[in-house]
Amino acid sequence: MLRAMIGGRVDSLPLNAAVAAALEPFGLQPRGWLVPDGSSAPRLKNGTVSEAICLVGHGGGGFWPVFQTWHEMHPGITDPLDAWSKAVIEPIAALLGGEAVFPSDRPWHPFQQWAMAAEGLKPSPLGLLIHPEYGLWHGYRGAILFGADAIAGSEPGKA
């Protein structure tokens, strides 16, 4: 279903544009890209080291109507926002040749550090990351890890 919905929109695009186009119908966006340090890079399921990380999130409330519609069709789910995030991001990651990871799942990934590196955010005295445009109305719903094969010929994060 996802390929039918967005496949034609992303098939011929560079990776960064394909990620943005795939996330947009769900009110999500690529929030930042980073190339992880080899020693701290998360491993993919095949055991290789990830070569690029795309943080996926929302800024403002654009995702909220999409999530609410989904939630009305899936009542009674525990942790509905986490479940929705997985239902959206996992198939997009697979379609684009990546793997999804989430802040709610083990092994824990350093989303706060990734956000500071990818978006240049600084923690407030309380430890919260406050975005210069969105303030506290932003969040990281997941990340897509890409291996060397998925990023071949592209410059992740470059327009």
Tell me the role of every PLM-derived stretch.
Residues L2-K158:
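Auxiliary alpha/beta "docking" domains used to position bulky ligands
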